[in-house]
Design a protein with these regions (language model features):
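Mid-domain catalytic core of redox enzymes
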Residues: 225, 255-375, 512
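N-terminal glycine-rich phosphate/pyrophosphate-binding loop and immediately adjacent elements
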Residues: 4-140
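Active-site-proximal substrate-binding core of FAD-dependent oxidoreductases
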Residues: 259, 496-517
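Structural core of flavin- and non-heme-iron oxidoreductases
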Residues: 1-34, 38-40, 45, 115-116, ...
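Active-site/ligand-binding neighborhood in enzyme catalytic cores
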Residues: 135-244, 251, 440-441, 445-449
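C-terminal segments that line or cap access tunnels to active or ligand-binding sites in enzymes
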Residues: 322-434
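A conserved FAD-binding loop/helix module that cradles the flavin
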Residues: 59, 473-495
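A glycine-rich dinucleotide-binding beta-alpha-beta segment and adjacent secondary-structure elements
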Residues: 187-201, 355-359, 418-477
Length: 517
């Protein structure tokens, strides 16, 4: 299962990309050591504890379950036996000023009925047409782009072939998501609802390509609630990697990636300890590498992300609160009254929006659809998120500004009928996120997906420095929990392929790895 020489890999960061790569590499006979400066795994998938109650304070939506099922299958394990998941009956509950409310469901037919009641039969029919296009967009891009190791516009066209050129044209890469949605929905609230999917990639619907409508299809394929919270997924991946032989060291801050004879040779920790390795996988934001956070010698490994090209950051409130009135479900969205202004303020003026949309994850609400607050836990664990500019390395967000955000949350919630009585709150700003993820300004999704070519400019696993590889949401195929996991698998596949080509005999096993069709 391994070559005569035992290859050693150091993984910098125990985020989802680093964890999946560690599972793959350790299972194939590579000696793996994961170095993480935080006290626990997960990266952005973090938990904060208030009054002894853990609150997911990072990604809260799990889709594309098959990514993790395939990972565990590839190393001889079963994902379902390691983690308990429940499919959400309602994808999200959406609210607008004036009391209008719309639920989207796991079943397209049920969502169409809800949209019909909300906005009329014609909008319901347009929704079905939109779903068809979202599915076609995903199916067109899944193989030649999402699962491809190093996609380019040329490779995408070549893999599509002459018969597939029409499909590529129909995904409308040169049209913005907002413009494309206008061709489907006449009700501005529905355009706003589905335009929000651009924020899943840290982007503006007014600048992101129409291809991002594929997110709608991904959600319709299933949104899953994780027993124990999203952080339990990180712990499950960590446990699997350990069973395969990977070692983990927490509280280990990497100061430098070593480069000798033009190739990576290991790392140096903040305490001066040198760890040698012939493979270094950086599960860190690519901006940190380009900014020299791991040493000047590796800054050339990947192109920098200009501050103007950064994705969204956020102001988040992890909260325990008594609730009354509005019946929260697991995922809730309270929309602003002027969506274009909201994104103009974030990406143009570089300030927190005056009237932002609010996302709320009510973590004590289950998967079953309810229209009442019966059996609600009190106080509830709530996670509020407001999109913000990634300028955490340029300015400080003062107390007055953050208090204004908090007041807006309470006011907008109350206008929708939700009464909140917070008992404990932890706040995270773009400045805090920049501290957690240096070199990013607090950007949470890498580079913004603005323009048709943005997705192709994300770096792939291989870098300009032999032996140094990348994984994570800022690398290909992009942000989000399943995509970050796929980036780890793609990186592991690239590493194994390179080791195989460099080692004549015996070969490093790659069976069961991710298909790169």
């Amino acid at each position: 299962m391994s070559s005569r020489k035992t290859h050693r890999a150091v993984v910098i960061g125990a985020g989802i990309g680093g964890l999946t790569a560690a599972v793959e590499l350790a299972a194939r006979g590579i000696e793996v050591e994961v170095l993480e400066r935080a006290p626990s795994p997960g990266g952005k998938m973090r938990q904060l504890v208030l009054d002894d109650r853990p609150i997911d304070s990072g990604p809260t939506v799990l889709t594309m379950r098959w990514v993790f099922e395939q990972l565990f299958d590839s190393v001889g394990e079963t994902f379902d036996s390691q983690l308990s998941l429940e499919q959400a009956e309602v994808l999200a509950r959406h609210s607008w000023r004036g009391g209008a409310r719309l639920d989207l469901f796991a079943e397209v037919a049920r969502s169409a009925d809800a949209i019909g009641d909300f906005a009329g039969a014609k909008e319901a029919a347009r929704f079905r047409a939109f779903c068809d296009r979202a599915r076609a967009t995903y199916e067109t891009l899944e193989g030649p782009f999402i699962k491809a190791r190093e996609p380019t516009p040329l490779s995408l066209t070549r893999k599509a072939g002459i018969k597939g050129l029409g499909d590529l044209w129909r995904i409308s890469p040169f049209t913005t998501l907002w413009s494309a949605l206008g061709g489907y929905f006449k009700d501005p609230r529905l355009r706003q609802l589905f335009g929000r999917y651009a924020t899943y990639c840290g982007s503006s619907p007014f600048e992101a390509p129409a291809t991002l409508m594929l997110v709608a299809h991904v959600e319709q394929e299933g949104v899953w609630l994780v027993e124990g919270g999203m952080h339990a997924l990180a712990r499950t991946l960590e446990a699997c990697a350990k069973r395969k032989g990977a070692a983990f060291r927490y509280g280990s801050d990497v100061r430098e990636i070593l480069v000798e004879h033009s190739a990576s040779r290991g790392v140096v920790l903040a305490n001066g300890e040198r760890i040698e390795a012939d493979i270094v996988l950086a599960n860190a934001d690519v901006s940190a590498i380009a900014a020299g956070k791991f040493g000047a010698s590796v800054a050339v490994a990947t192109p920098p992300v200009a501050p103007k090209s950064r994705s969204l950051s956020a102001v988040t409130f992890s909260m325990l609160a008594k609730t009354d009135g509005f019946p929260l479900t697991r995922h809730n969205v309270f929309f602003s009254t002027n969506y274009r202004r909201e994104f103009d303020e974030i990406f143009g003026a570089k300030r927190i929006p005056t009237n932002p949309t609010i996302y709320v994850c009510a973590q004590d609400r289950g998967a079953v659809w309810r229209q009442s607050n019966d059996n609600a836990v009190s106080p509830e664990r709530l996670f509020f998120l407001i999109n913000a500019p990634a300028v955490g390395d340029m300015r400080t967000f003062g107390t007055e500004e953050i208090e204004r955000c908090r007041d807006h949350i309470l006011d907008l919630s109350q206008r929708a009928g939700l009464i909140l009585e917070p008992t404990a709150t932890a706040i995270t700003t773009p400045q805090d996120f920049n501290g957690l993820f240096p070199g990013t300004g607090g950007a949470l999704y890498g580079q913004a997906s603005h323009g048709w070519n943005a997705s192709f400019t994300r770096p792939t696993a291989r870098t300009k420095i032999p032996g140094l590889y990348l994984a994570g949401g800022s690398a290909h195929p992009g942000p989000g929990v399943p995509m970050a996991a796929m980036s780890g698998r793609l990186a592991a596949a690239s590493i194994l392929e390179d080791l195989t080509s460099a080692t004549p005999s015996p070969r490093v096993a790659t069976s069961g790895g991710m298909s790169m069709a």
